[in-house]
């Protein structure tokens, strides 16, 4: 069966139900839900204009149905490390980019994997820049705050992050 724009076989299986068309959005939604992101998908998909910065496996972390930019797009290897060289610089970038959410894929950050980025996320939470933390199967979605958050709330959020986020395990790799 011919299944691609190049008229080659084998890329996508044809199903008569959809007359040969492939619903890539449904496929990505199923793949993301398999990784434990059902409610996170639903939240960010409420508005296709939502802007998300994703700390996750590239390019799969870009598949949410909104405006997603990976952390790698912003910093090394493809971006400008000056944008994230301090929490203040990253906050400035998020304000400039009108970022709504930050997403952290379960098992992506931790000792041996993007440690500096993990410390940056912790600092953003401690400073109150990320609020309304939501966890699903070790994945995290946090709202970027444009208002000052009380120190006690920020500390509670940081403790919740340490407890609920599923960190990268180098020994399991």
Residue ranges of each PLM-predicted region?
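Short aromatic-enriched loop/helix-cap "lid" or pocket-rim segments at secondary-structure transitions
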Residues: 1-5, 64-67
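Membrane-proximal, lumen/periplasm-facing interface regions of secretory-pathway glyco-
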Residues: 2-42, 59
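Extracytoplasmic
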Residues: 16-19, 45-47, 53-96, 111-128
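Generic structural signal of hydrophobic/aromatic residues within well-ordered alpha-helices
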Residues: 26-28, 90, 120-121, 161
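Structural motif
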Residues: 32-35, 54-58, 104-108
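Beta-sheet entry/capping signal
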Residues: 51-52, 101
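Aromatic/acidic, Gly/Pro-rich catalytic loop(s) in extracytoplasmic/lumenal soluble domains
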Residues: 100-173
